[in-house]
Amino acid sequence: MIDFKAVIAKVATGASLTRDEAANAFDAMMSGDATPSQMGALLMGLRVRGETVDEITGAVTTMRAKMLTVAAPPDAVDVVGTGGDGSGSVNVSTCTSFVVAGCGVPVAKHGNRALSSKSGAADVLNALGVKIDITPDHVGRCVAEAGIGFMFAPTHHPAMKNVGPTRVELATRTIFNLLGPLSNPAGVKRQMIGVFSRQWVQPLAQVLQNLGSESIWVVHGSDGLDEITLSGPTAVAELKNGEIRTFEIGPEDAGLPRAPADALKGGDAEANAVALRAVLEGMPGPYRDVALLNAAATLIVAGKAKDLKEGVALGAQSIDSGAAEARLKKLIAVSAAA
């Protein structure tokens, strides 16, 4: 049993926790062995000082050890944003996921309801007719039969219930906003992760390097978007062959036009579902372009495309052939089947 008071005292001096100390502290929180005051103190102490790569790695190790897992092929990918970018945009990573699945890459998408926006991945999928509150085995069947499955975070991370009330009361970003995308219940080794702040691009790539991921892009748009943006450059940290490389990309690198950030303004779940379906049905415009751009990056991560332009061409084929929309229809059917 960890001495939680000693952990708080250490953080209060400005010192960093070791990976093991962080893992044990988060185990205490998620097991219900820490009081709400203790949890709030530690979460805010870490937030104010700035969470380290070792602290995040330790916390993720505990999250992963406690989650309910899903069976998925070794080449499965996840496209996920941390959320919390305050943009109120359409659901980019969700749309991107269907485009990628339509290219024949299995997608095991992890997500939740909106925390800060009007429509998170779970909200828009629910509005599209996908059943989201299904068992881990059922999600595995979706990935196997539909080529895409959605893992609703509360179902797969039941231990989070001990931390939930404290997070709600704090009502500000904590380390948990970073942990969700790093704790995919299907254990995917290939991911496209969007983050709400540029300061986290390289550290999250380092965390995933520590945890043995194979192929990762961590991205942050210059306009604040937790995706690759159309309005300007996007910062990228790429993990490949155990090495991390950082660079910037723009839509022109993919042969796509720029568009202002407000061209991607979204609405509630129903409005965003209508917009997403329109993209899968072939409607041109900025939403299609941003989905193609993010799909192109994901296809590079998956080893399907050698560069962004090839990825965009494959993504366009996925939409225009009807393959992407077929993945959505199949997911609706398989998720509804008992």
Swiss-Prot record:
Residue positions binding 5-phospho-alpha-D-ribose 1-diphosphate: 81, 84-85, 89, 91-94, 109-117, 121
Reaction catalyzed: N-(5-phospho-beta-D-ribosyl)anthranilate + diphosphate = 5-phospho-alpha-D-ribose 1-diphosphate + anthranilate
InterPro entries from the UniProt entry: Anthranilate_Pribosyl_Tfrase, Glycosyl_Trfase_fam3, Glycosyl_Trfase_fam3_N_dom, Glycosyl_Trfase_fam3_N_dom_sf, Nuc_phospho_transferase
Protein keywords: Amino-acid biosynthesis, Aromatic amino acid biosynthesis, Glycosyltransferase, Magnesium, Metal-binding, Transferase, Tryptophan biosynthesis
Domain of life: Bacteria
Binding site for anthranilate 1: 81, 112
Gene Ontology process terms (BP): L-tryptophan biosynthetic process
Record text on cofactor binding: Binds 2 magnesium ions per monomer.
Cofactor dependency: Mg(2+)
Keyword Glycosyltransferase set for record: yes
SUPFAM superfamilies per UniProt: Nucleoside phosphorylase/phosphoribosyltransferase catalytic domain, Nucleoside phosphorylase/phosphoribosyltransferase N-terminal domain
Name used for this protein in its record: Anthranilate phosphoribosyltransferase
Source organism: Rhodopseudomonas palustris (strain HaA2)
Gene encoding the protein: trpD
